[in-house]
Amino acid sequence: MTDTIYALSSGRPPAGIAVIRISGPQSLAILDRFTDGARRGKPRRAHLRSLVDPADGDVLDQALVLFFPAPGSVTGEDLVEWHCHGGQAIVRAVLDALQRQSGQFALREARPGEFTRRAFENGRIDLNEAEGLA
């Protein structure tokens, strides 16, 4: 797996909070790009950061940003989570901005179940656990 994937991991908007997950080898570079080079902070801890659209520099939202280094993440890969406001416009703007970065990174939207598949393939969950999530 050389590509990096992203998806809305929480329920569909509108909601109070939306969780957008990014997993793969370029997830930390994407985090740096969207936080305009702000200091990452410590792994596994939430940090308040502005999410900035790399295309035009517009602030998309203020979000809690977390990163989980491989191999200790849920997928076994470098993983980033953005906990942003769950309104439809904000979620769509963030997902659209990620899509626009697919030319800069080996980045694409995750297929259904792909985070689980990567967790299984990287030994983070066994077959019984994977089937339990289906």
Describe the function of each predicted region.
Residues 1-134:
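A glycine-rich (often HGG/GG-containing) alpha/beta subdomain
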